[in-house]
Amino acid sequence: MMKQKYYQSPAEIASFSPRPSLADSKAVLNQAVADLSVAHSILHQVHWYMRGRGFMIWHPKMDEYMEEIDGYLDEMSERLITLGGAPFSTLKEFSENSQLKEVLGDYNVTIEEQLARVVEVFRYLAALFQKGFDVSDEEGDSVTNDIFNVAKASIEKHIWMLQAELGQAPKL
């Protein structure tokens, strides 16, 4: 008498439904890699070129923002690799592919103007993360979807706090 098999191996289960290519999710992840790399550079510039009232508070806060951005960069790069993609990894690739544009540092820019620039960068990232959320949802990629959702929630909170510091509503 032959024993009936009631379970299947993970490979057999995975073979039931072929995984989609997730091309759009990979494209948005790579866009995020480029943009997060440039965002880090912009935050670093704000950190270095900041002068005036509030310096002692905002200078270390930029370190916190950079650390958070670096965490998203690493997570999204590694997710892209996990999906079979190849993340941008050179300054040239970041610069050519990022939608964020860098400007020369200027000590004459006020802290308020610097913070407004950070808000502008964070608004762009929040919109990009929303796009990543939508695309990964359409492709059924729940892990990438979660990554974008968590990142967007945190960035939106930073926008709210920065806008409050600037005496403005968050306008999300």
Swiss-Prot record:
Changing residue 146 to A: No major effects. It comes from Streptococcus suis. GO terms for biological process: intracellular iron ion homeostasis. One of its GO terms (cellular component) is cytoplasm. This is DNA protection during starvation protein. Fe cation 1 binds at residues 47, 74, 78. GO terms for molecular function: ferric iron binding; oxidoreductase activity. Changing residue 103 to A: In strain: KU5.
